[in-house]
Regions:
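Positively charged n-region of N-terminal signal peptides that target proteins for export
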Residues: 1-4
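Bacterial N-terminal signal peptides
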Residues: 6-16
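Non-catalytic cap/lid and distal C-terminal segments of serine-dependent acyl enzymes
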Residues: 21-283
Length: 283
């Protein structure tokens, strides 16, 4: 009998451990604003189902031609493994991580309308703030306030996260850009010359120009957000990151900037992810 009880206890312990593990859910949101369905992945921390607690939310944006899976897939960001390591070590709090999909409409494969900004016929930024965030706050136990939200991203998503935090500083407490696509020197009036519409939308939504032209009131709002950025020393975007950092310093908006050994690849971004998780809700 003692052996049976011991065996049953072992089974129940394993079941409880499995139920308590972190997981990634894939959701489909029917957007009235976009007139389309959009996918997103959501990481839920260990114990979410049983704790009854509310959690802070990190919105984590993928890069150009990436997907909602980029940050959590093996060989990509490997978020579940890294998040569990950081949380277990006490370096980051338990959090929900939302990874939206910004691939546009054309069979959801990218290209046309890809990106995080409103363009004609595809108001993605409007969808993000008027539909996605409210949907997440309604479906999950979130801390639905500025102190409970952060945003981060890589490359195109890094630029998107910075612009979102600039325009919606009341929504996010922190912003982290890794290898951010923060500006372009292309001609703003001729997107066809480069054949890629999303680069044109980036050029028209420059975070560097935003800071340069910001009013004193807008600069004060920027100071209500904690800013951090990094880039590889051999990354082709390091110069534009330096320009943004210089402009933020000129405007006296505090920002941390790290240039590390690396290029524009997943090795660099995986190494950045622990710092993203630590920084997002640092006390």
């Amino acid at each position: 009998m003692k052996r049976l009880i011991s065996t049953l206890l072992s089974v129940f312990t394993v079941i409880a451990a499995v139920q308590a593990q972190s997981r990634v859910e894939q959701l489909t949101i029917k957007s009235e604003i976009l007139g389309a369905e959009k996918i997103c992945s959501v990481y839920l921390p260990d114990g979410y189902d049983t704790s009854g607690e509310s959690y802070p939310v990190l919105y984590l944006l993928h890069g150009a031609f990436g997907t909602h899976r980029s940050w959590w897939r093996t060989g990509g960001g490997e978020l579940p493994r890294i998040a569990e390591e950081e949380i277990a070590a006490g370096r980051a709090p338990k959090m929900i991580v939302v990874m939206p999909d910004a691939r546009g409409l054309a069979e959801n494969k990218g290209g046309k309308n890809m990106g995080y900004f409103d363009v004609e016929g595809w108001p993605y930024e409007t969808f993000f703030f008027q539909e996605l965030i409210p949907y997440i706050d309604k479906k999950f136990r979130t801390i639905a306030a500025k102190d409970g939200r952060a945003i981060a991203g890589l490359s195109m998503g890094g630029g998107g996260s910075v612009v979102y935090a600039q325009r919606h500083s009341e929504v996010f407490n922190a912003c982290y850009s890794t290898s951010g696509l923060l500006d372009h020197r292309y001609r703003y009036d001729d997107p066809a010359r480069y054949g890629i519409e999303w680069l044109w939308s980036v050029a028209h939504n420059s975070p560097t120009e935003f800071v340069k032209n910001a009013t004193p009131k807008e600069l004060e709002k920027l100071r209500s957000v904690r800013w951090m950025m990094d880039c590889g020393d051999d990354d082709f975007l390091v110069d534009t990151n330096l320009r943004f950092f210089t402009e933020m310093n000129r405007a006296k908006v505090p920002v941390e900037f790290r240039i590390r050994d690396g290029v524009h690849d997943w090795k660099f971004w995986r190494e950045a992810l622990p710092e993203i998780l630590r920084f997002s809700f640092k006390k």
